[in-house]
Amino acid sequence: MARFVLRRLLYAVVVLWLTATLVFVFLHVSPVPVERVIGGPRATADTLDQIRGNLGLDRPVLVQYWRFAGRLLRGDLGDSYINGMPVTALIGQRLPTTLCLVAGAAVLWFAGGVLLGVLCATRARGLGDRAATVFVLIGLSTPPFVMALALLHVFSAGFGGGAVHLFEAGPPLQEHFLRRIVLPWIALAFLMIATYTRLTRGAMLDALGEDYVRTARAKGLPERRVIARHGLRTALAPVVTQLGIDLGALVGSTIVTEKVFGLQGVGQLVYQSIALGDTPVIIGVTLLVTSFVVAANLLVDIGYSVLDPRVRLR
């Protein structure tokens, strides 16, 4: 296990380095010059040359890359081109909101999807199973931004405000924010609850048909114990694997969700940075998302081996 974790950590370092390099190259060949972004449309040629010199953009590309790599190794992501703030501080201000959004939605969809999937599998072809099938079809057909807009229109009158002013930006631990972030959770989780209900139902039906489950029932074990200890544990393995994949997609979905609900999170930050051409912030957010995805997949691999003892990490 220790060797596996160490190897995956080294793999994570390589992935982060390649990601940073690719982003650096893509942004370096951007059709919008950085000095034009900072100086504005009315900047003179002398002003643009001065900006390029201050940023070191007049040096060869390899020199710029090694300078960028050296700062990255020190944990220095540079300063924002737009407001001059350090990128780490800028991301740190927005990160709690996005973490609260991602964590809440992930817990909601995983718990809700697994619970509904188990109930459908244990009552296959019953009324509840058929109702859940209809819910799954609706959920799979509803994109998160459509659900977000629908929730805004339905609940805005109840909160006493329009869609624009319904959600106030602020730390996620404030009472008003906790109360109002439930709707973004639902908007993000609705589609995934349907997906995980279908996935868990199929995996659970396969697990309950295995010989070791029939043996456990033949021994007279209580049905709840058979389902929880023998059926669910095996059925969760593919579900947890899918969770590692979907967590990365969830981070991307927060960009649209934060935009719709007016939440000042990392998704809103990267949206604004792309629109304004703020290169350091784009690189910083990209590395953050990559780190999150790599860490999530590492935890999923470890969890898979715990759920299914037949799997051994090497």
What is each of the regions a protein language model found here?
Residues A2-R3, I91, L95-R130, P144, ...:
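Alpha-helical transmembrane segments of integral membrane proteins
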Residues V15-W66, F155-R180:
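Hydrophobic alpha-helical transmembrane segments of membrane transport/permease proteins
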Residues R36-I38, V63, G78-Y81, M147-L149, ...:
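Short, hydrophobic secondary-structure boundary micro-motifs
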